[in-house]
């Protein structure tokens, strides 16, 4: 099946009624949106789950997590996960066909509460929002639909211009910290990155950036989101944008 990869394997042992879904079922939101991996296939993933649900397995041994027992329990787990994936993809494609940008879609798609409350659909590893991006990438390519980002200016130049227009780097840093303290983490991150790109070696920027991303990380339920944001925090402790960089 196509899912986490384009050659994902699952198996069924008819005599014992044992299903081995591999990583197509992991007792969590499916790992279909990993920000640091290649293309994943959300609708194909759902198709594979539905195919498995028709086998009437009595024991399921997932790639991660506990075994599941009982024909009806297994069927419900598989079909509800498929419904969850299909619903997200259907919403995304509908909005893409209306000419909406990726940013608009990220903030417009709604995740079904009744499905998110199921014990096997908790966003503890992947974040449902990341699935939106993966679907966009599959059908819409790398351009996010923002016309000014098709041929972007150098970010440091753009950031410096914004800081010049504001009139003070300190004002931006202070506002970013204020937003972080108000749990407006996304806006805080936007502002502090603008501050960073305008003055990458500024110690006050890195101090604020460390705090802002540490706070943002703590709010994440998914380990993917938490770890990436925490990486930014740790990098600023070293005066870097990213830990992979080398200091001059």
Label for each model-derived stretch:
Residues 54-59, 67-248:
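Accessory terminal helices/loops
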Residues 2-100:
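Metallo-beta-lactamase
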């Amino acid at each position: 099946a196509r899912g986490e990869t384009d050659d994902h394997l699952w198996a069924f042992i008819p005599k014992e009624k044992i299903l081995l879904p591999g990583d197509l079922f992991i007792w969590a939101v499916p790992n279909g949106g990993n920000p640091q991996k290649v293309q994943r296939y959300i609708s194909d993933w759902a198709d594979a789950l539905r195919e498995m649900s028709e086998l009437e397995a009595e024991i399921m041994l997932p790639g991660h997590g506990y075994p599941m027992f009982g024909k009806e329990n297994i069927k419900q787990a598989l079909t509800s996960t498929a419904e969850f994936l299909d619903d997200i993809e259907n919403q995304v494609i509908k909005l893409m066909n209306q000419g909406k940008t990726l940013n608009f879609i990220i903030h417009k798609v709604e995740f079904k509460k009744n499905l998110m409350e199921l014990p096997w659909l908790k966003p503890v590893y992947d974040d449902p929002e990341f699935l939106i991006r993966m679907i966009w990438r599959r059908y819409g390519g790398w351009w996010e639909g923002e016309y000014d980002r098709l041929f972007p200016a150098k970010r440091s130049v753009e950031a410096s211009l914004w800081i010049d227009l504001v009139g003070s780097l300190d004002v931006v840093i202070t506002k970013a910290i204020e937003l972080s303290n108000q749990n407006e983490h996304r806006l805080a991150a936007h502002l502090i990155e603008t501050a960073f790109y305008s003055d990458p070696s500024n110690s006050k920027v890195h101090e604020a950036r460390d705090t802002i991303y540490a706070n943002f990380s703590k709010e994440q339920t998914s380990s993917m989101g938490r770890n990436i944001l925490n990486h930014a925090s740790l990098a600023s402790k070293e005066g870097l944008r990213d830990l992979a960089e080398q200091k001059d």
